[in-house]
Regions:
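Short, recurring structural edge motifs at helix starts
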Residues: 91-97, 125, 155-161
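Short, hydrophobic/aromatic-rich segments at coil-to-beta transitions
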Residues: 6-11, 26-27, 44-52, 72-74, ...
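Short hydrophobic/aromatic-rich beta-strand segments that constitute the beta-sheet cores
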Residues: 14, 28-31, 52, 73-77, ...
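Edge beta-strand at a domain terminus
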Residues: 1, 76-93, 212-220
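Contiguous, well-ordered beta-strand patches that form the walls/edges
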Residues: 18-21, 31-81, 174-181
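N-terminal helix-cap/turn-to-beta initiation motif at the start of protein domains
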Residues: 1-11, 24, 97-100
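A cross-family detector of function-defining hotspots
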Residues: 13, 104-150, 163-220
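Mature extracytoplasmic domains of secretory-pathway proteins
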Residues: 5, 15-49, 144, 148-167
Length: 220
């Protein structure tokens, strides 16, 4: 417990700049941590319940943390609120003005209310907001963007590199200085071919026949 609390030590803010969590010295928001249980995952990327002693009694907080000692470190509070060490964590790449870590409200401000909410399989096994005119989809972890899918035929691009599904895999390797050219399958297998780091704890993966390029915070 001490190890995990030390890992998360510091102040954690919501997207509006409000300090939501203050962790340090065995305390959360000035309340002593009495116990922790239901741990899952590893020390740097995991989840657990923390029982704290408030003036009115005990309370449980469910925390999921992703600590890579980077500006994008995050804690998800009670499954619905994403917190960072700064109100506006930096981002590396964007698509149609949308980047990882944006809130749902910020996405709506840029792209408008999503016309559709779709099951995004086979690209990813979750539902997401779909903008058919742009041919892009956005998924969320709690209240922040965790994936942006750029589909074939979209006029949108990865705004740092200028690339999209019309480009060849080797062009992505050159633009993002990847260690090797991404492997793209040209069959109906839908086998996942891996993620490719592009810096800033962001990753790209590629669908069959370059039907989709996905920008994600996940490395697997």
């Amino acid at each position: 417990v001490t190890k995990v609390l030390n890992l998360m030590e510091g102040d954690w803010y919501d997207a509006d700049g409000n300090r939501v969590l203050e962790i340090g010295g065995g305390y959360i928001n000035g309340c002593r941590v009495l116990a922790a249980y239901d741990f899952a995952g590893a020390s740097s990327h995991g989840a657990g319940r923390f029982e704290i002693l408030e003036s009115t009694g005990t309370r449980n907080l469910y925390l999921q943390w992703d600590i890579r000692h980077a500006d994008t470190d995050s804690i998800k509070l009670n499954d619905h609120q994403m917190l960072h060490r700064t109100a506006k964590p930096p981002f590396n790449e964007s698509i149609a003005g949308i980047h990882l870590g944006m809130t749902a409200a910020e996405v709506t401000a840029v792209l408008g209310t999503p016309p559709q909410v779709l099951d995004l399989s086979p690209y990813v096994n979750t539902h997401g907001w779909y903008y058919p005119d742009l041919r892009i989809a956005v998924t969320f972890d709690a209240d922040t963007v965790d994936r942006i899918l750029l589909l074939k035929g979209s006029r949108a691009i990865l705004e740092r590199s200028g690339l999209n599904c019309e480009n060849a895999p080797y062009e992505f390797a050159q633009a993002y200085q990847m260690k090797h050219v991404p492997h793209v399958r040209y069959d109906d297998s839908n086998v996942f071919t891996g993620c490719h780091a592009i810096g800033g704890e962001e990753y790209l993966s590629f669908g069959n026949r370059m039907e989709c390029v996905m920008l994600s915070k996940y490395w697997n």
